[in-house]
């Protein structure tokens, strides 16, 4: 039934997916990146939901969340690519709506992967959720012109650093130390994505809003699209890999 609903949902989405494009210029690399990421997100969503049948019960929720992350992003990318191709404007509102839903889910994955293998306090999830929301809210305020770009950038980066601390040296790391080697390996890899993969976002913000006349919506969106590809899809694949390994050893 789950697979049937997934296929049905994909079929329903296809007309909208096909209609929101217009002509794509071969030299518009940002537009091409929108299309590539959209297709990759859909493929990843199908993959994660189908692969739920391969893992044990305690890992199914993690794969479900991975599928939700890529599925929600796919839906918003259908609209974002349309805005870009038709107007050439940065789809800031659509992008932040997407991030407001998917970034807390990505953060939730850290809690879920630890909860599946060891005991972890619920306070960790609350801290990470607050940190992610602060990062997103101030990022949006800076991009939307609600507040000055530099202060918003600094506050957002501080929230990101706070989350890294909690995961690298705080409650998250303490819980990870009691998990299996496979879970620890996955956790550490996810940490590197949070540190280096998420660093792509402030690079995009800086390029688009803090470089004066040198900034451009083209560079901003190309960088953001790359970041979403890495952080949403690769993140989920790491979860899938450890889930399959742990399930086969059970």
Swiss-Prot record:
Stored InterPro entries: Arc/bac/fun_rhodopsins, Proteorhodopsin, Rhodopsin_retinal_BS
Assembly description: Homopentamer. GPR protomers assemble into a pentamer around a central pore with a C5 symmetry axis.
Native organism: Unknown prokaryotic organism
Residues on Cytoplasmic side: 54-58, 119-121, 178-180, 250
Membrane topology: Multi-pass membrane protein
Site (Proton release group): 143
Effect of residue 143 to A: Reduced GPR photoactivity by about 50%
Site-annotated residues for Responsible for spectral tuning: 106
Localization per Swiss-Prot or TrEMBL: Cell membrane
Entry GO CC: plasma membrane
Function, in words: Light-driven proton pump.
Post-translational modification, as annotated: Contains one covalently linked retinal chromophore per subunit.
Name of this chain's protein: Green-light absorbing proteorhodopsin
Top-level taxonomy: Bacteria, environmental samples
Annotated site, Primary proton donor, chain positions: 109
